[in-house]
């Protein structure tokens, strides 16, 4: 009996050439594509393309709301930016994709799962770590990695097997996109001294071409998650789409960086994440207003670990669950509205309010006659605050001269 294999399918070059390759190995291929909000994607065409190049069946799963509510929302609450700027665009969708692929594999009595990742990328680890966690007995095929294709060889193989090739050898970008953003690599971008050309960007205008007048928006959060845009309640997936357009039109969300990959190499990545740039900036600003100081100062330690765990394929782990429980606890008070100014590549918080959770007390902060802060208590506080270092210094005189006594 012919074995069935479930392929994580995107419609792109890597996963399209995987279909005839897997068929040559004797598998019946079931292509599965997840709709996680890929901009401008024609899922009917993608589904048909898989069938045209030889898949036994082609399945489309609409997972946009699931992706936003269960994968994007946690990274918003955790301010998760890998190496300080990358909002984990591709890394976020991988465990969700595998969760659905494993379910479909079980339903279809498939014995294997395939992906189109290369041996140099992070996604091979993310896909296979999730498969091992969810079903250790499931076989794994990785044709692009295991056959050692170069990009040029892959294009030639595609043409030999009648797989449509929408790119050329001179500019073979590799693009991955979802609700949360767009990742672009390869081609001219592989030389870090080459500036990203205009055609490398797909969700944003250049900041120079953005409108000369700023756009102002209000983002309302409930327990750390945005729930309304300009006072209009909406699902998170819908809001992200709206903000991708608004922020993208203002040139916001471009990231051009050298990134440390999980597999140990540095890579040049070009990302666009317009909605993420706005939401993350607004969320961080609201935390400044609502989080107690010690919590606010300690939280980045947990955020950094969570961010690295997501990037490094450790979403499915007890430590990740425990750390997210801490994050969720902190977000109970992150309720309020932030006014954002979108202008020529910048998303800036210009006002904020929280009716029930603001820790800002104007009477304490003011320098006017309405000041209620007890300034006379400051001298005693300072003396007690510095007592440990004062005693140490007077005993050891590391930074001071010892007084001579007669």
UniProtKB/Swiss-Prot annotation:
One GO BP: L-arginine biosynthetic process
UniProt GO cellular component terms: cytoplasm
Amino-acid biosynthesis listed as a keyword: yes
Binding site for ATP: 8-16, 116
A GO MF label: argininosuccinate synthase activity
InterPro entries: Arginosuc_syn_C (IPR048268), Arginosuc_syn_N (IPR048267), Arginosuc_synth (IPR001518), Arginosuc_synth_CS (IPR018223), Arginosuc_synth_type_1_subfam (IPR023434), AS_cat/multimer_dom_body (IPR024074), Rossmann-like_a/b/a_fold (IPR014729)
Enzyme class: ligase
Cysteine disulfide links: none
Cross-referenced Pfam families: Arginosuc_syn_C (PF20979), Arginosuc_synth (PF00764)
Recorded metabolic or biological pathway in which this protein acts: Amino-acid biosynthesis; L-arginine biosynthesis; L-arginine from L-ornithine and carbamoyl phosphate: step 2/3
PROSITE patterns for this protein: ARGININOSUCCIN_SYN_1 (PS00564), ARGININOSUCCIN_SYN_2 (PS00565)
Domain of life: Bacteria
Reaction it catalyzes: L-citrulline + L-aspartate + ATP = 2-(N(omega)-L-arginino)succinate + AMP + diphosphate + H(+)
Major location category of this protein: cytoplasm
Subcellular location: Cytoplasm
Keyword annotations: Amino-acid biosynthesis, Arginine biosynthesis, ATP-binding, Cytoplasm, Ligase, Nucleotide-binding
Residues reported to bind L-citrulline: 86, 122, 126, 174, 259, 271
Amino-acid positions noted as binding L-aspartate in the UniProt annotation, renumbered to this chain: 118, 122-123
EC number: 6.3.4.5
Record text on subunit structure and interactions: Homotetramer.
Family of this protein: Belongs to the argininosuccinate synthase family. Type 1 subfamily.
Name this protein carries in UniProt: Argininosuccinate synthase
Source species: Lacticaseibacillus paracasei (strain ATCC 334 / BCRC 17002 / CCUG 31169 / CIP 107868 / KCTC 3260 / NRRL B-441)
